Amino acid sequence: MINQLIANIKKTGAPIVVGLDPMLKYIPEHIQKKAFAEFGETLEGAAEAIWQFNKEIVDKTYDLIPAVKPQIAMYEQFGIPGLVAFKKTVDYCKSKGLVVIGDIKRGDIGSTSSAYAVGHIGKVQVGSKTYAPFDEDFVTVNPYLGSDGVNPFIDVCKEEKKGLFILVKTSNPSSGEFQDQMIDGRPLYELVGEKVDTVGRRLHG
């Protein structure tokens, strides 16, 4: 999948990603009014406004950018309708040839991590049928619970030819409380970065 992202970057000449992190209060009033007229001031109405706003952004930019990054929490706050809007956004972006990076920052272990991986970049079996629930191309993963939180995602990536962005050093103001802690003279995030690099080299190509 990284090859597709690189190809898109070369094609557009734009090593950037457009974040789709919608906040209802910033969505243009005419979009909100139309959505609320159809669905009322409900979760469904909010989700429809988000979806229409995203669609307009994508329609205006899809031939200029290589990828988009929807932040799932902005959709989850509107419950099931919000997740429907997230899925519609993912599908629409992919139909326009964009690489979709699901900004989900999952970090758990064992079967829970496996379920996250399957739900977002893998396939799930339901009886005799198979489904790709959210079907992003990449997802973001938090590695600070250890390798048993990341390995299930790696396994699914191998199977489905998907990709990961693994957090190493984050930009939030309090990140240094843990990430900058010194271990044998080196900050923790450097050790995490080395581990991620090792995994990446093993999966390269």
Model regions: which residues?
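Acidic (Asp/Glu)-rich catalytic clusters
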Residues: V58-I65, Y92-S95, I154-E160
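Glycine-rich, proline-tolerant flexible connector loops at the mouths of alpha/beta enzymes
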Residues: A46, P70-G82
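N-terminal glycine-rich anion-binding loop in soluble enzyme alpha/beta folds
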Residues: M1-K60
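Conserved anion-binding
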Residues: D108-G205
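Generic structural signal for well-ordered alpha-helices
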Residues: I2, N54-V58, F86-V90, V150, ...
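Hydrophobic beta-strand scaffold residues
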Residues: I16, V100-G102, L164
